[in-house]
Amino acid sequence: MERGAAAAGALSCTFRSPSPSPTSPAAPHWRPLLGFRSRSRSRGRGWGQRAVVAGAPRLFLPPPCRRFRYCSQSKLLGTNKGQNRCSLATFSSFGQSGISLNNEDLVKDKLLIDCGEDQDCVIDGIVALGKFDALHIGHRELAMYASKAGTPFLLSFVGIAEVLGWEYRPPIVAQCDRKRVLTSWAPYCKNVVPIEYQVEFSKVRYLTPRQFVERLSRDLKIQGVVAGENYRFGYRASGDAAELVKLCEEFGLSAFIVRSVMDTARSYNGVTTSVNSSDKGQVSSSRVRHALAMGDMEYVSELLGRKHRLVLTVKENHLQERKRIMLPKSCMLNMPPADGLYENCDLLNGGHLGLCRVIINSETIVIEMKDENSLLPNTIQENQQLGIEFG
């Protein structure tokens, strides 16, 4: 769990809920991706009819992963963007949970913090597991499959760098901008906005893989999990996807293991030289950071599935002219691209202010508007947040 940040003890956590979609369900409910057996330990004919893509091969893994099949659907990144290749290996197991759904228990144990009337919001949900720092297309794929199986949630961890003593790096997505990004995923998630559920890493750092899954089942009372094939969890990342499936079966949860979304441009500009030894060509946050460091915004957009948005908070020492704004780099709330000149950008302040070009140097960010009438007096004010989307 050290590097994979994959454990969940819901002792101290914050719940971040985007604005509900008009088509979002009023309460969590189970929408099966495939047919599942009933909540009985009976083997035999208890299995439902499984909707498997014609011609898709079966995936056989050693015990205890006894029943897996492929549901072929995916997106490959690169020049041939229309091709699909990612697969979903699915295992489902239900047992008698013996779990009370009494909200008083949740409140008493302080499992969900500041959820208001939605104290039972995560109950019976399908939780996608990961770091979700970049919210890239691989993360979106996990949310998409979670929505096929039920009400989608993202379970991520905060404070990892501080706990492990890593050097500070600005986030790829500004914290205040995550809600917008998740809302943009609704068309991929059956018009449901995934809800992000964050846990303090310091509270779960030493959980074993078994304790992690037990917390998901006993404390959060979820219905199932979705994870990538390279997912690691538990203390010192000691658990892998196969063990996750085994433990989910034991605790009566469904487990959906999704193949990585591959980056067909993985050798582009030497990107593979910048990522860690576990990289096998999959879309990753490390690739996004490297592409930003190269200043290749087209490649960044492909990895993210959207334009990269740099968010800034206007400070009192900003300089505004008729067509020009100058801000210190200390205004930035997330990772910028490399120093340089960027054409065809968009400036936003809740609405669209206009097209601009952006010049980033070692100390400042200069925004030059295409239209001299875009920046009227008092358009930009102190403590206001601005967004720059790079074309």
From Swiss-Prot:
Cofactor requirement? Mg(2+)
Q: Where is the transit peptide?
A: 1-53
Q: GO cellular component annotations, sorted alphabetically?
A: chloroplast
MF GO annotations: ATP binding; FMN adenylyltransferase activity
Pfam families linked to this entry: FAD_syn
Where does the record place it? Answer: Plastid, Chloroplast
- Which domain of life does this protein belong to? Eukaryota
Q: Extract the ranges annotated as region (Disordered).
A: 1-31
The Enzyme Commission number assigned here is: 2.7.7.2
Q: What chemistry does it catalyse, as a reaction equation?
A: FMN + ATP + H(+) = FAD + diphosphate
Q: Which UniProt keywords apply?
A: ATP-binding, Chloroplast, FAD, Flavoprotein, FMN, Nucleotide-binding, Nucleotidyltransferase, Plastid, Transferase, Transit peptide
Which GO terms fall under biological process for this protein?
FAD biosynthetic process; riboflavin biosynthetic process
Protein's UniProt keywords contain Nucleotide-binding: yes
Report the pathway entry: Cofactor biosynthesis; FAD biosynthesis; FAD from FMN: step 1/1
Decide whether keyword Chloroplast is in the record. yes
What is the protein's major site of localization? plastid
Q: What class of enzyme is it?
A: transferase
What is the documented function of this protein? Catalyzes the adenylation of flavin mononucleotide (FMN) to form flavin adenine dinucleotide (FAD) coenzyme.
The name this protein goes by in its record:
FAD synthetase, chloroplastic
Source species:
Oryza sativa subsp. japonica
Q: What is the lineage of its organism?
A: Eukaryota, Viridiplantae, Streptophyta, Embryophyta, Tracheophyta
